[in-house]
Structures are given as C-alpha cells and as structure tokens.
Swiss-Prot record:
Species classification: Eukaryota, Viridiplantae, Streptophyta, Embryophyta, Tracheophyta
Pfam family membership, one: Ribosomal_S14
Gene3D superfamilies cross-referenced by the UniProt entry: 1.10.287.1480
Protein's recorded name: Small ribosomal subunit protein uS14c
Record-linked NCBIfam families: PRK08881.1 (NF006477)
Swiss-Prot/TrEMBL keywords: Chloroplast, Plastid, Ribonucleoprotein, Ribosomal protein, RNA-binding, rRNA-binding
Gene name linked to the record: rps14
Length: 103
C-alpha cells in the first residue's frame, strides 16, 4: 500500500492539470500555429505565460496509480490495477471476462 500522502499528492496534480488544461493547450496551439505565425516577441510572451503556470499542472507530471493500493508501477490501463492485484482478482474470479492463460 502506498503512503496516503503520495496518493493525495497525485490527486492534487490531477486537479491542477484539469484546471489549467485549456490554458496550456491554447497557449501551445498559438505558439505552434502555422496559419497565423506569431512574431518572436509574441512567442516569448506566450512561452512566459506557459512557464508561469504551476509545474504540477503539466500532464507529464501525472503518474498512473493502482485503484486499490496506490502502487505506481506495473499498472494495466484497462483495469486501473497493478499487476499483482489484477492477478489476485482474476484468480478469485472477480473480473468478468478475464481468464488465466494456459497452453
């Protein structure tokens, strides 16, 4: 089980990312625009605006965690669970449609 503080920190990052998502996306779109190119000074202003946003609002700082244990590694996106929890749940027949492989 992961520490509660780490799980809360991750939730806080998710909220920040959702809050600043539109601002970040529109700023990046304006900087990269080929249709109406910005001057160099306008681009630097937009870049400064991006840099003024909180670091934890960047989507790259988010980390997928296990739904039950909060474990940050070996997560399966389809289930939102870490590998060993997924395995235990499949063995206990708690996940519909998931079966053990045998050959």
């Amino acid at each position: 089980m992961a520490k509660k503080s780490l799980i809360q920190r991750e939730k806080k990052r998710q909220k920040l990312e959702q809050k600043y998502h539109l601002i970040r996306r529109s700023s990046k779109k304006k900087i990269r625009s080929k249709v109406s190119p910005l001057s160099l000074s306008e681009k630097t202003k937009m870049q400064e605006k991006l840099q003024s946003l909180p670091r934890n609002s960047a989507p790259t700082r988010l980390h997928r965690r296990c739904f039950l244990t909060g474990r940050p590694r070996a997560n399966y996106r389809d289930f939102g669970l870490s590998g060993h929890i997924l395995r235990e749940m499949v063995y206990a027949c708690l996940l519909p449609g998931a079966t053990r492989s045998s050959w």
